[in-house]
Amino acid sequence: EKGYHAIYLPPTRAKVRVALEKLKNECALQEAEYAQAAVEIFQLTDYKSREENYYSSMLAKADIEKEIIKYTEGIQGAIFASGRREYIVFSNSGAVQEEFNQRKLLNLQKKVQEENKISLNVGIGTGGTMNEAEMNARRALDFSLKNAKQEIFWIDAGQTQHGPLGKEIQLEYQLISSDPKLQEISEKT
């Protein structure tokens, strides 16, 4: 209307092809990340079996196990007891990272604490293999236990630690530095 010349430059076939290839690669990468192995390790702390309340403590533990099983069913995982107070859940990264499932996990943790006065510490690990995911979950659980608070930490396949989940301020940092100067210093020591 103002007399300016307008020129329409349609994208070339090559640019369209490159854009579609890039989109396809991004989708494949995201799908691969969500298909990674995930392991969650639940550990009951502050759990004391008293002789005078032997049966009531067994019933409380059974109620907690039911809740953990319901959570595991919701994420379509598999659960295994490991010792008296530890449970290992195998799933995929997509299910574990989903915000809805993380809220369910936080609610489970809160419910166990309020109803049974038992802390439920959780370590989550993801990785290319179940072994790598479990090692990451163990490290995350150790960090949770070290803080002596009821918290959830997660270590991903890239060795980045996230947490505590569900808190207003969540930290995210690399456990292994990629800085060449720091790597050189660590090799010398």
Segments predicted by a language model, with ranges:
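Interdomain helical linkers/hinges and coiled-coil/dimerization scaffolds
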Residues: 1-84, 157, 161-189
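Catalytic strand-loop-helix junctions within cyclic-nucleotide turnover domains
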Residues: 47, 92-99, 118-136
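Two-component system phosphotransfer/interaction surface
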Residues: 16-24, 134-145
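Short beta-strand->loop micro-motif that forms the acidic, two-metal-ion catalytic signature
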Residues: 79-97
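Short amphipathic alpha-helical segments
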Residues: 56, 60-64, 100-104, 133
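Generic beta-strand/beta-sheet core signal
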Residues: 82, 90, 123-125, 155
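Catalytic/regulatory signature loops of cyclic-dinucleotide turnover enzymes
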Residues: 111-121, 136-180, 184
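GGDEF/GGEEF active-site signature
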Residues: 91-115
